[in-house]
Amino acid sequence: MNIVEQMKDVLKQEIKEAVMKAGLAEESEIPEVVLEVPKDKSHGDYSTNMAMQLARIAKKAPRNIAEEIVASFDKGKASIDKLDIAGPGFINFYMNNQYLTKLIPAVLEAGEAYGETNIGGGERVQVEFVSANPTGNLHLGHARGAAVGDSLCNVLEKAGYEVSREYYINDAGNQINNLALSVEARYFQALGKDKPMPEDGYHGEDIKEIGQKLADEFGDRFVHEEESERLAFFREYGLKYELGKLREDLENFRVPFDVWYSETSLYQNGKIDQALEALREKGHIYEEDGATWFRSTAFGDDKDRVLIKKDGSYTYLLPDIAYHKDKLDRGFQKLINVWGADHHGYIPRMKAAIEALGYDKETLEVEIIQLVHLYKNGEKMKMSKRTGKAVTMRDLIDEVGLDAVRYFFAMRSADTHMDFDLDLAVSTSNENPVYYAQYAHARICSMLRQGEEKGISFEGNLDLTKIGSEKEYDLLKVIGSFPEAVADAAEKRIPHRITNYIFELASVLHSFYNAEKVLDPADEEKSRARLSLMKATQITLNNALKLIGVSAPEKM
């Protein structure tokens, strides 16, 4: 807990003490103290609606209650300069903000660890995200899911959760058979032989590349081979190629995974039969019309679900249940799936399966990623100008740069449709949020370099009483709220809370820079103190940018 959080706790306790001292309520009757930061700075540093909350208990008008709380309040302990009452009974607190300077040495000492909290308490969380079929390039929805999923993992780790990042490889379904048939057609075509593409084939450039690669490497060897053997080889070859490309793309996007989990392994290791048997033992399976059904309506689903069809083939749901059972068997306490919007209707049946297996259905959380629309020159863009095909993640990174893609995708709530303005993403103006944030970091680094060049160091003992202007305190307040922003983003699963924080920190930094001189030739101690404030800001901004996978340049 940093100094800002400590002081808020002291203030909350002193408000309770004042309530009891005024005889307005017993300690057990006092509601939780809520402290808000007023939008208008002239209304103080914090405000509470405690008087309104107590009106029913104290049987008095909120304004009168507020007056009694103020009269009984001990200003000394909570570092308060003054209090006043606004409107129907809001109490505003004006802090003696010198206490904020204690943040500077604390942030400098913490370094990369600044912002860490332990609200997660080491809870084991598995986040499964992206999990795109290994049959083509990653599209914009995958890119958004990758950015959101990775940022969420970073935030959860910073907040004290033990996180495992997992990619589920859909390598067992019909789409892999179609991949093999598509590769076969492109292989024959690369050899100049006629072979039509399958009806549900994949027409991407990558499939042509695989066909050409096979032709170059093996010549016409497979033309004369047994079809089943040829397709088995093409299946493995194509899968390996596509997976290699996916891994490379995600690595370049700064999205690491701890586990790449193969769907095929569920079949090989008997996990599907085990899951089916577990549900059967608990009485949640029945046979009807030659099919095997899961009684999911018993757990809130709108209809029962087929697991094994009449022809003996599995529906998608059965291996998915087996996969989620395996996740739980591995000891994860919370499962977070980051899914595309087309999976929304799938949530109730998966939660039903979790509950049917004997777990709390809330163990599974699903974050939905909504669609992305690209705009250029104010017009919606459907196809890549370069390829004439749907825009891929690679295309987008080539167009606007990696940092812009990561920042923009982390910037909005995942469950809202996103309009991605390509022109804004490459502009070098304050309207571009990633430029605004990175420029703030580069600006701080420039100030630190200037101090170094002039031989002014912030190492050693500092006179932090030299820090005292309104702009400096504004900066310290935002720096001090970083651990709270991390905790909030983690608890609510909203990584975009961090981009909001970054924008706020960059704003107060630019405002400080425009109003104050960091290096004062007439006062070296003041310069040293301000350089230490700049270093604390740089550490905080760098740590925040790292959470969303965005670089922090030292020069721009």
Swiss-Prot record:
GO terms for biological process: arginyl-tRNA aminoacylation. It catalyses: tRNA(Arg) + L-arginine + ATP = L-arginyl-tRNA(Arg) + AMP + diphosphate. Pfam families: Arg_tRNA_synt_N, DALR_1, tRNA-synt_1d. Its EC number is 6.1.1.19. GO terms for cellular component: cytoplasm. A motif ('HIGH' region) lies at residues 132-142. Its main location: cytoplasm. It is an enzyme of class 6 (ligase). One of its GO terms (molecular function) is ATP binding. It is found in: Cytoplasm. CDD domains: Anticodon_Ia_Arg, ArgRS_core. Keywords: Aminoacyl-tRNA synthetase, ATP-binding, Cytoplasm, Ligase, Nucleotide-binding, Protein biosynthesis. Belongs to the class-I aminoacyl-tRNA synthetase family. Monomer. This is Arginine--tRNA ligase. The gene is argS.
